[in-house]
Regions:
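Small/polar loops that bind or transfer phosphate-bearing groups
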Residues: 12, 117-118, 144
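Generic enzyme active-site microenvironment
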Residues: 3-5, 118, 179-180
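Short, acidic loop-to-helix structural element flanking the phosphoryl-transfer center
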Residues: 3, 57-61, 88-116
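Short glycine/serine/threonine/alanine-rich loop segments
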Residues: 72, 113, 195
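Charged linear interaction tracts used for macromolecular binding and regulation
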Residues: 77-79, 94, 120
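Asp-based, Mg2+/Mn2+-dependent phosphohydrolase catalytic module
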Residues: 102, 106-107, 121-255
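Active-site neighborhood of HAD-like aspartate-dependent phosphohydrolases
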Residues: 1-41
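A metal-dependent, Asp-based hydrolase signature
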Residues: 38-88
Length: 255
């Protein structure tokens, strides 16, 4: 089983980040607005080396931290985020699906690997975005509002048969791969239980160990292929080719 992140992994692009920054800062005075926009541009170009907001995990957090620092309140930030998710549904928003990764997921599914998309993005608006980017044929299951990192731990527990959840797959940890660009959310929950961790460290943060690390998903394709060659039984059935159902949320620990 391969568990993939969404933002910055299955798709990428800085247009949503810049839209979020513009929307969040639009009520600020011009000089303060410029600090936010320039700081976000610097972070996207330099990552952890950016002096403006080196502590940010990704571009979304860079916007949030800079905007809060300059006086944008939480309600305005949430409105800016919601507006950005709507913007992402439009062809006016430039987004890229890494073709090599998409092709690899198709190959893995044909070879019997179950692909799960686990994202903290809310279910609302997610399905049309997945359809806009033609991503549903690449995955077997979509888990929206995962609540990573804790929610990813629960998802993995379900798949490893440790939670008693109906449908638990009973996989061995070494037959699970987690991939994403946020080490604490996407990688650590997997490597903690012995899964293969593939970490996209675009911004040079080096937040923690992984079995494979690269600045782009393209740098992880060969390690993923090598993992699949040893982790997937040669007799594994091919994954279904029908579009994945959209799950609104991962069941809680008490549900």
């Amino acid at each position: 089983m391969l568990v993939t992140d969404f933002d910055g992994t299955l798709y990428r692009g800085d247009d949503p980040i810049r839209h979020y920054a513009r929307r969040a800062a639009r009520e600020l005075a011009p000089d303060r607005r410029r600090i936010v926009l320039d700081g976000v541009d610097q972070y996207l170009a330099m990552g952890a080396a950016a002096s403006a907001v080196p502590e940010a995990i990704d571009g979304w957090e860079a916007v949030m931290l800079l905007a809060r620092r300059l006086g944008v309140d939480p309600d305005a930030l949430q409105a800016a985020f919601t507006d950005t998710r709507v913007h992402m549904l439009s062809e006016a928003c430039s987004l890229e699906v890494p073709s090599g990764y998409a092709e690899l997921l198709q190959q893995l599914r044909a070879g019997g690997v179950r692909v799960v998309l686990a994202t903290n993005s809310p279910a609302e608006g997610l399905d049309p975005l997945l359809r806009r980017l033609d991503l549903l044929p690449l995955v077997d299951e979509v888990v929206a509002g995962t609540g990573k990192p804790a929610g990813l731990r629960r998802l993995l527990q379900r798949e490893l048969g440790g939670s008693g959840t109906v449908g638990a797959a009973g996989l061995a940890p070494e037959r699970v791969l987690v991939i994403g660009d946020h080490w604490r959310n996407d990688i650590e929950p997997g490597t903690d239980i012995g899964a293969f961790g593939a970490y996209i460290d675009r911004f040079g943060r080096a937040d923690g160990p992984a079995d494979a690390t690269a600045t782009t998903v393209e740098g992880l394709l060969e390690p993923i292929r090598k993992w699949a060659a040893t982790a997937v039984p040669t007799t594994a059935p091919a994954a279904p080719t029908t579009p994945a159902p959209l799950l609104k949320a991962l069941p809680s620990e008490t549900s």
